[in-house]
């Protein structure tokens, strides 16, 4: 009897092993396809290259001069004779009046560093000049009650810098390119050509010293205006062109947050508790990236907290979340510290900090900084930001100009608390670069202009490559938001959408807590350099479902 059971066990084990090997082989094949279709990884090596046939004749007109627009202008300068950037704000001002989250905490994924290195020569030295750093992409994450830890050196590098400083870096580089012209103003109209297949010219209402109306011929028009979505409005209101309408799907997670730039006195840098207590997570101030990121489960708390060293001698300390009341805004740094302690305890299922050396050290570090700021008479100011709805625009459902593209939030906006906005725009930029390189330019006889032009299929090719690379961010963040109280759903949808993903994510976290290699694989996907399919690797999926029986 025992021998029979042993034979059965052996055969079951062999069959299960073969089945898993087959699944892994199928998954590996699908993954190779997914790397190309759902990430911009294969585009990175081609950044900075020129089209073999030469430059496209005419202007690439870029509406919007923020992060997406500036990066788009850099890429277009390699392919077009001239680039015109239209931006309502003055490029001489450091502040950004039209970007709500300009002074808030920003997360930058590893893909952002890779793209920026590809489009800007000597990017790292420029980054250091502006107070930024390159470090491992360790977010010091606690998801629910689970801390995620990693083997040193197992994570990809990313950049640490404030949004304002990064934008200043990009502005300086854009201004150094002689073929890029920056016009302060707003695009007010687009004019189709006689075939109504493409945009022929763009009308601009200038601002500043000159308030004249300008017109620019457009070899390509890129909407990089973010939530203003100027391209949507201009295309749909262009009469007799037959463009649009384009369905816009939106939901509102009711996100708000507040951030303060906290100076760290020089006398404290080497003696902060997170450094002196010999913790694995922290080494020195010069190598400090994230201090802590805490994302409680929905039933624990609707607030999240993040602390990161941004530029030079400062920490950016933020708190935000879903459908928060006015009382949730920190009024002072002391109030912020109390909120961090409260959120941390809620995320830890009510457990105190006793016995958690890392948690105690972080809280003691914050309190030490608070005391020092009091001694120096410095009162940090928390700046509040309330975000609008998340949305996607379906430009594939109706006719559109063949030389029209849209980059970043002007096409797809996701919940900013996940920190994907800039990286998502840079994925679009890398995709645009690849599509132009792969495009067969048409001669003047096809466009009515001298030199080379874009083919009639260009816009469709861009959207076909762009959508699968960014739409998974919409799907995953939307599914997460639907698990939060107060989220206003897409009309006709229910909170059940995304429930499997939310439950599976908790189970995957359990695996990551026990397996540092799996944790690193998961983070690479979240850093947008590996496909989301990596979260469904058979060995990970099976373990996730097993650990799910114990998931909180």
Stretch-by-stretch model annotation:
Residues 1-61, 78-82, 91-95, 151:
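Extreme N-terminal leader/targeting segments of oxidoreductases
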Residues 6, 17-38, 434-552:
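C-terminal helical "tail/cap" subdomain of flavin- and related membrane-associated enzymes
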Residues 64-67:
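Glycine-rich Rossmann-fold phosphate-binding loop(s) that bind the pyrophosphate
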Residues 75-79, 91-142:
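N-terminal FAD cofactor-binding segment of flavoenzymes
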Residues 81-87, 462:
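Short beta-strand "acidic-cap" motif of Rossmann-like dinucleotide-binding folds
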């Amino acid at each position: 009897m025992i021998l029979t059971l042993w034979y059965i066990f052996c055969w079951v084990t062999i069959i299960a092993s073969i089945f898993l090997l087959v699944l892994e082989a199928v998954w590996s094949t699908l993954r190779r396809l997914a790397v190309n279709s759902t990430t911009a990884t294969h585009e990175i090596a081609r950044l900075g290259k020129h089209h073999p046939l030469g430059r496209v004749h005419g202007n690439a007109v870029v509406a919007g001069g923020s992060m997406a627009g500036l990066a788009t202008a850099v890429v277009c300068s390699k392919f077009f004779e001239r680039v015109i950037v239209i931006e309502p704000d003055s490029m001489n001002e450091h502040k950004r009046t039209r970007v709500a989250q300009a002074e808030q905490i920003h997360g930058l994924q590893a893909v952002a560093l890779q793209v920026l290195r590809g489009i800007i020569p000597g990017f790292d030295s420029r980054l250091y000049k502006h107070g930024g750093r390159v470090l491992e992409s360790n977010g010091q994450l606690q998801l629910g009650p689970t801390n995620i830890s990693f083997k040193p050196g197992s994570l990809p590098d990313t950049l640490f810098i404030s949004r304002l400083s990064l934008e200043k870096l990009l502005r300086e580089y854009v201004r150094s390119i002689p073929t890029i012209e920056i016009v302060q103003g707003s695009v007010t109209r687009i004019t189709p050509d006689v075939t109504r297949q493409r945009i022929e010219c763009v009308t601009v209402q200038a601002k500043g010293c000159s308030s004249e109306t300008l017109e620019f011929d457009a070899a390509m028009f890129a909407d990089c205006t973010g939530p203003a979505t100027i391209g949507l409005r201009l295309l749909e209101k262009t009469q007799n062109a037959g463009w649009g309408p384009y369905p816009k799907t939106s939901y509102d997670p009711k996100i708000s947050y507040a951030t303060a730039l906290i100076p760290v006195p020089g006398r404290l840098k080497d003696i902060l508790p997170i450094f002196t207590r010999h913790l694995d997570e922290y080494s020195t101030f010069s190598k400090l990236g994230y201090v802590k990121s805490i994302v409680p489960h929905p039933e624990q708390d609707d607030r999240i907290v993040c602390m990161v060293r941004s530029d030079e001698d400062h920490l950016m300390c933020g708190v935000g979340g879903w459908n928060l009341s006015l009382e949730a805004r920190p009024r002072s740094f002391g109030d912020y510290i109390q909120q961090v302690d409260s959120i941390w305890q809620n995320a830890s299922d009510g457990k105190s900090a006793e016995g958690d050396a890392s948690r105690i050290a972080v809280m003691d570090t914050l309190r030490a900084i608070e005391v020092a700021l009091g001694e120096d008479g410095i009162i940090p100011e928390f700046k509040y930001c309330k975000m609008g709805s998340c949305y996607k625009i379906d430009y594939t459902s109706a006719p559109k100009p063949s030389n029209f593209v849209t980059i970043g939030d002007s096409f797809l906006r996701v919940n900013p608390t996940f920190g994907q906005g800039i990286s998502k725009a840079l994925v679009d930029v890398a995709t645009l670069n690849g599509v132009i390189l792969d495009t067969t330019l048409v001669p003047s006889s096809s466009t009515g202009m001298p030199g080379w032009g874009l083919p009639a299929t260009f816009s469709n090719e861009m959207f076909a490559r762009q959508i699968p690379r960014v739409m998974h961010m919409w799907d995953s963040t939307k599914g997460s938001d639907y698990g939060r109280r107060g989220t206003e759903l897409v009309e006709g949808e229910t909170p059940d959408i995304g429930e499997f993903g939310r439950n599976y994510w908790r189970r995957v976290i359990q695996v990551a807590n026990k397996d540092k290699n799996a944790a690193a694989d998961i983070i690479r996907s979240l850093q947008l350099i590996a496909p989301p399919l990596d979260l469904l690797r058979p060995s990970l999926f099976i373990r996730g479902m097993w650990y799910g029986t114990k998931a909180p």
